[in-house]
Curated annotation (Swiss-Prot):
It comes from the Eukaryota. This is Small ribosomal subunit protein uS2. GO terms for cellular component: cytosolic small ribosomal subunit. It is found in: Cytoplasm. The keyword Magnesium does not apply. The gene is rps-0. Keywords: Acetylation, Cytoplasm, Ribonucleoprotein, Ribosomal protein. The modification N-acetylserine is found at S2. GO terms for molecular function: structural constituent of ribosome. InterPro entries: Ribosomal_uS2, Ribosomal_uS2_CS, Ribosomal_uS2_euk, Ribosomal_uS2_euk/arc, Ribosomal_uS2_flav_dom_sf. Transmembrane segments: none annotated. PANTHER family: 40S RIBOSOMAL PROTEIN SA.
Amino acid sequence: MSGGAAHSALTEEDVMKLLATQAHLGSTNLNFQMQQYVYKRRFDGPNIINVKKTWEKLLLAARAIAAVENPADVVVVSARPYAQRALLKFAAHTGATAIFGRFSPGCLTNQIQKTFKEPRLLVISDPRIDHQAVTEASYVGVPVISFVNTESPLKLIDIGVPCNNKGERSIGLMWWMLAREILILRGKISRQTGFVLEGKEIMPDLYFYRDPTETEKEETGAHADVAEAQEYQQPTDIDFTTQGGKVDDWAAETATWTAETKTTEEWANAPTQSNW
């Protein structure tokens, strides 16, 4: 395969990334069609995927995607929550059309739908979860590229990239590596400079899934740090004794209860009027 070429050989750095994100760990079940990609079975059950064959299939998938003249004709689909962030980043960097979340039935076959699309290539994260998209692609003759685990069925899948497609970090790394290889084949980046776009290095963790609760905690902590960093300005003390002028004694102005009051006249002593 092309993975043996010197310019596209699997580097030690990429191997370390695959091992760090556990992209080589498959499930405990094994499909007979995936047996050719399994290196060995671990003592506690999981199947170990051969990372060399993963790399070869990844390069084949990247060449198929890069061969599409219009990048928007490549539709990427994933209903798995862990892959949706990676899906959006992949579409933004490669120009593909992203469909994340629930795949509407008839999106590829029903022409009267508003979401109807006519792709030339379909890329998915899991053939089990995205089975509706795979079925409709087979009806209209659209090739399908998928990340597959050791238990995934390869029926209706044209190119399967063996990897751990259920891990939060592993699926993000696979989308990142696929986007990098596509951009290298298109000539937008080089293998020597790395994954650098517009002067910014695109790291693999940009494609990783982020828990909304953890993001909220980080934002809350950042606001608390900003509030503590702001200095509290205490009000200036004013010394009233230094001001000029005489200070009146308010107590002297209050009326006392012992003050003399005007006596009222008694009505009985008033003279009576005899002449009506």
